[in-house]
Regions:
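Alpha-helical DNA-recognition elements
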Residues: 61, 192, 283, 356-360
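Minor-groove-contacting beta-hairpin "wing" of winged helix-turn-helix DNA-binding domains
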Residues: 369-375
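The catalytic "switch" region of P-loop NTPases
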Residues: 7-11, 167-173, 177-269, 283-287, ...
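Winged-helix-like regulatory helical subdomains adjacent to P-loop NTPase cores
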Residues: 278-347
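Short, amphipathic alpha-helical interaction segments positioned at domain boundaries
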Residues: 376-394
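P-loop NTPase nucleotide-binding core
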Residues: 38-170, 180, 186
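Walker A/P-loop-proximal flanking segment of P-loop NTPase domains
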Residues: 1-62
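Short amphipathic alpha-helical interaction segments
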Residues: 343-360, 365
Length: 394
């Protein structure tokens, strides 16, 4: 029996589909690290589009001459109960870079010893490492020594490359980068990274996240006045076309078949987004022709399974964020004046929450000056919950 995974599978190569073009683009540009050409990347796309799968596949298949570190900021955000500080992020960078060094058999014997020797040479206030676990490093110690530690962490990847002939480059992926907007001064943090990339020739950063194309954080990092000033290699991961969706289902599903109208409705529901395709296919009947009515009924009956990622996101939102989303559900796209007239708080507060939703990839801003929900699946899920339960989810 075939099963289409709704989480990233262990055997990522088995389920990798239709991202060969993007894979080759990234792989080719990263190979330039060996030549001292450090490209920096910004990868965006809808939730569930396959950004993380693409990057996991990319890192898995890179040659051993490249060290890689994968930093998922949602892990830090979750551990800190929705709060994020520069100190915690720097600590995460340090811990995961250390893990990358330790996992490389070519350098493990000497690298950790050098790492701690160098850290102790920083002469931090009231702290000595003594080969203790970096995870145990107290945040107040980092705060008191932030300038020293941030400089050390930012310089470390290039120093590793310079210290070992076998290592030709260091690649650092920062997933859910939009969470950096929660820092006290996110712009300063982006500029911190930028300032070191200008002096490093074998280190590449890959920022990725589910953010709107018009999100403020995109401009903050790669806009004309942003830290990287438009110099990042920017790649948006697109949805599957109808033909690609058909081929994907034929290859990986448990013999799911459609008539023409059934497939049209299925594609309209999923919009070619792999996460929705997988979860929907897993609940459809196999070895029979799925008609438009079968698709409609299955969608309504299983909306919580199909829109699972939005259930998770909804639980993390504030009341004001939910209030704004429901306003878009009930009214469609809205301009600034309409929004101001329909909320009970100040325009400054409204602007703050619109920025939050945009940076989370939930709303976008159109060329005609209106805000709207970026993913219609969220609207469908909320509407169906209201119809079946008489109220929106809390």
């Amino acid at each position: 029996m075939n099963y289409m995974p709704i989480v990233i599978p262990e055997d990522i190569d088995k389920y990798f589909y239709n991202r060969n073009k993007e894979f080759k683009i990234l792989n080719t540009n990263l190979e330039m690290l060996e030549e001292g050409i450090p490209n920096q990347f910004l990868i965006t796309g809808y939730r569930g589009i396959g950004k993380t799968s693409l990057l996991k596949k990319l890192l898995k298949n890179l040659p051993d001459k490249f060290l890689t570190t994968y930093i998922d900021l949602s892990d830090v955000y979750g551990r800190q109960k929705g709060k994020l500080s520069e100190e915690e992020v720097i600590k995460e960078f340090l811990c995961l870079i250390e893990e990358s060094i330790e996992s490389n058999e070519k350098i493990v014997r000497t690298a950790k010893e050098r790492l701690y020797d160098t850290l102790n040479q920083l002469k931090l206030k009231s702290y000595n490492f003594n080969n203790s676990n970096l995870r145990d490093l107290p945040l107040p110690i980092i705060k008191d020594n932030y300038n020293k530690l941030s400089k050390y962490v930012m310089e470390l990847p290039q120093k590793v490359v310079d210290s070992f002939d076998e290592i030709k480059g260091f690649i650092i992926v920062i997933d859910e980068f939009q969470l950096l907007k929660n820092l006290e001064n996110p712009e300063a943090f982006f500029w911190l990274i930028r300032s070191y990339t200008q002096k490093q020739y074998n280190v590449s950063y890959i920022f990725t996240g589910s953010v709107s194309n018009t999100a403020e954080i995109n401009n903050m990092i790669n806009g004309q006045t942003g830290a990287f000033g438009g110099r990042m290699f920017q790649l948006n991961i697109d949805e599957f076309s109808k033909q690609q969706t058909k081929e994907y289902i034929d290859k990986y599903s448990n013999n799911i078949k459609f008539d023409d109208e059934g497939f049209e409705r299925f594609y309209k529901c999923t919009r070619g987004i792999p996460a929705y395709i997988n979860s929907f296919c897993n609940i459809l009947p196999n070895n029979m022709i799925c008609t438009s009515e079968i698709i409609k009924e299955a969608f309504i009956m299983n909306i919580d399974n199909i829109a699972l990622l939005w259930l998770r996101v909804w639980g993390t939102l504030t009341d004001k964020e939910k209030e704004l989303i429901i306003m878009f559900v009930e009214n469609g796209s809205l301009d600034w004046t309409s929004l101001v007239n329909n909320v009970s708080y100040t325009p400054v507060t409204l602007s703050h929450y619109l920025d939050l939703l945009s940076n989370k990839g939930i709303i976008e801003y159109s060329s005609d000056g209106k805000y709207y929900l970026s993913d219609i699946m969220l609207k469908r899920w909320l509407n169906l919950k209201k119809q079946t339960r008489g109220r929106y989810p809390e």
